């Protein structure tokens, strides 16, 4: 999973009694649950869910490092500024769990507001790869305002926060650059697997070059020349893939 909107789809199958059994379904909680009810009540609710409906998975948007308190949550999506250590991601992945990150209206960089540098959408893909996340969630995809073609503002939210595509199957520069970032992240993932599987000195050297290339993109404080660094990194990535 490289991109997911804030939608969880549960697939169901009919059981022998005519009821509905969830298959790969997840109950999703956003950040407001803990803020509203508190961590202890949140844990009690999750424990009850695990006891009464163990076939359901749990997905959670997390801005308080709650994944440490709820290690059984199948899919955790943390706020971009709350980076999950690589060893925690690896431990969760070993259990078959997914760890992603998200951006929303309070995150300055990287983001995809109407006024954002379009290259930030590409950077989001590189940040995903550099941190080792399984994917990225962007709020939001198509929560359109009253006149989305002419005014992207919504209340006090940054302009363009609530949607990245337009009605009538219209794309946007922001969305197309995000696709570019996703493609880069997928290419990085594929190359890592290929270099590891090859097991040759040349492949090991290329793997090291790729890791060094990524090391400069695991930050969310933009440097003055970040656009140039991104362009150069994309060029080197293409060289490594040849």
Describe these PLM feature segments.
Residues 17, 26, 32-149:
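Catalytic-core regions of glycoside hydrolase
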